[in-house]
């Protein structure tokens, strides 16, 4: 690639940014850097650069940062790229998940599988395969070091280009059931790549300056943004090291086909590009899918009758369907053999946060002010990104990432029954925030009955003859219509009490989402006499299945957990 002299390059970029800001309509560019001029964005501390070349290589380039969160336990290994840049990451399949959390997630998943695509609540992740365990983001600390040579650098600015910390296997082990794969064609194959989905001259300019700094320092670590089909790359990983799609599909297949996961369903979404059809690569995508997943277990578009409701997940699994594949692009007849078009599935929506708390549960910043209570059973998949490029956010704009799916927002999202919340940087702690049925650290008793008591929205194990409890009854035609029985009964009589209600369409049941659980709790607190202490839930069978069985090991079978002092390998 032809390289322009640094001074000419910086002037050219400054002129581009000045023109960009001058032509913008509406509010001026936000400037948290308090620059005197937009040109100052690209001013470098050149004297410092000249002094720091040797020191940079010692303190930054050759450093091996530990990128495993402090509260995560796993097998730590040293992951290096082909240039010798390394970081400490978690080995595939070794992230520990507490037993209570594994069981709580499995319980909620069993309940969710009773609902269909349009109403089930199952955790997802954003850009699932752009993860640190597979090398995405390993070079970030080098580019973060380059930031120090910008005149406006402030302590705390980061370069963070991986969406996830852990492998696909670990995400699945943590309860994720919606996987997003960013698929692009370059270097003669389909790869997992975070390619330019938006146009940001600010990001393009920063990448160019990063590469000029690399030349001045003599590090040889430049941002690969020139790959055909992937320009710019939004990750610091070299294009030739971005993972082949086949490897990701193989990993998903290995997990799904393990005997202990025979009762699980997986949703896979390809965030792909229309060029795959133009380049005649859709057939290759389908061939890769069929190589790792038997066609008989794939739910395919022609197998559904669209004028009827979507089947429940448990119904699909009973007939051997275990996985569904969706695409962000309509490939017409080329893709319809296997791929559902995302936008045609349950009026799919990806609204931005914030989300108003229960009972409103509306995405107030969405254009249509949509929300869970609309009862049109739309799939809501909010996704948020925590990628950072110094002073640029995940959208390549000046500013920070706001309204994130994290430990603070996810409990409210769970209470509203949002279908597929898909955050960045999923961890066991972040998954804890999605639990609505069981209190932290608590395990239910598989030999007892289950009730929702006044003192908490989480469930309790109680004696099956506990007095002063009403049955929770749901409309068989509408899982969001809940009422309570007329009078207290023992648990064994709850089904008859619901069937005796005047409507004739009510049955004794159990909430399948945080939203349904909140509806039942609201009935208890607002409509039941004060003498009623709680509500029977038809959950004994599910609780018995989950809490009477052994859960998976905290890490992958056969993998012990050790500190980096004990295990230091290169993957």
Feature-to-residue mapping (PLM):
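SF2 helicase/translocase NTPase motor core
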Residues: 305
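Long, acidic (Asp/Glu-rich), low-complexity accessory segments flanking structured domains
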Residues: 26-178, 185-269, 273-276, 280-284, ...
């Amino acid at each position: 690639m032809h390289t322009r002299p640094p001074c000419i390059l910086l002037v050219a970029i400054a002129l581009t940014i000045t023109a960009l800001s001058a032509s913008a309509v509406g509010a001026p560019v936000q400037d948290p850097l308090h620059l005197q001029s937009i040109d100052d964005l690209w001013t470098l501390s050149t004297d410092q650069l000249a002094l720091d070349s040797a020191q940079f290589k010692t303190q930054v380039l050759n450093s091996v940062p530990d990128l495993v969160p402090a509260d995560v336990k796993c097998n730590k290994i040293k992951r290096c790229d082909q240039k010798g840049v390394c970081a400490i990451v978690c080995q595939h399949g070794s992230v520990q998940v507490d037993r209570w959390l594994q069981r709580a997630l499995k319980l909620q998943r069993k309940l969710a599988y009773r609902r269909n695509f349009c109403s089930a609540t199952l955790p997802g992740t954003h850009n699932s395969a752009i993860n640190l365990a597979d090398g995405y983001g390993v070079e970030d600390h080098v580019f973060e070091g380059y930031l120090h040579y910008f005149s406006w650098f402030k302590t705390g600015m980061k370069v963070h280009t991986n969406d996830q910390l852990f492998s696909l296997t670990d995400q699945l082990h943590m309860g994720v059931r919606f996987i997003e794969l960013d698929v692009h064609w370059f270097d003669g194959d389909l790869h997992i790549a975070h390619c330019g989905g938006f146009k940001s001259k600010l990001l393009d300019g920063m990448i160019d300056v990063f590469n000029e700094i690399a030349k001045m320092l003599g590090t040889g670590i430049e941002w690969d943004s020139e790959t055909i089909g992937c320009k710019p790359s939004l990750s610091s990983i070299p294009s030739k090291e971005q993972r082949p799609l086949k490897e990701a599909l193989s990993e998903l297949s290995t997990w799904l086909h393990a005997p202990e996961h025979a009762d699980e369903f997986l949703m896979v979404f390809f965030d792909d590009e229309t060029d795959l059809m133009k380049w005649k690569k859709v057939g290759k995508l389908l061939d890769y899918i069929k190589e790792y997943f038997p066609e008989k277990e794939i739910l395919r578009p022609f197998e559904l009758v669209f004028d009827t409701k979507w089947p429940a997940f448990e119904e699909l699994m009973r007939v051997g369907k275990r996985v569904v594949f969706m695409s962000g692009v309509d490939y017409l007849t080329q893709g319809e053999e296997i791929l559902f078009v995302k936008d045609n599935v349950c009026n799919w929506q990806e609204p931005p946060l914030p989300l108003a708390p229960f009972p409103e549960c509306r995405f107030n910043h969405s254009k249509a002010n949509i929300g869970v209570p609309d009862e049109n059973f739309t799939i809501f998949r909010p996704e948020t990104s925590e990628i950072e490029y110094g002073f640029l956010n995940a959208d390549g704009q000046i500013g920070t990432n706001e309204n994130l799916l994290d430990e603070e927002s996810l409990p409210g999202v769970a209470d509203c029954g949002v279908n597929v919340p898909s955050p960045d940087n999923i961890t066991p702690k972040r998954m804890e925030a999605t639990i609505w049925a069981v209190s932290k650290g608590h395990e239910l008793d598989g030999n007892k009955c289950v009730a929702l008591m006044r003192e908490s929205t989480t469930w309790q194990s109680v004696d099956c003859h506990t007095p002063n409890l009403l049955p929770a009854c749901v409309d068989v035609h509408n899982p969001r219509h809940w009422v309570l029985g007329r009078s207290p009964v023992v648990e064994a009589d709850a089904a008859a009490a619901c069937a005796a209600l005047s409507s004739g369409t009510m049955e004794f049941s159990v909430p399948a989402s945080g939203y349904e659980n909140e509806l039942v709790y609201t009935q208890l607190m607002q409509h039941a006499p004060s003498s009623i202490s709680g509500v029977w839930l038809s959950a004994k069978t599910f609780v018995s299945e989950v809490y009477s069985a052994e859960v998976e090991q905290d890490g992958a079978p056969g993998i012990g957990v050790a500190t980096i002092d004990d295990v230091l390998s290169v993957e």
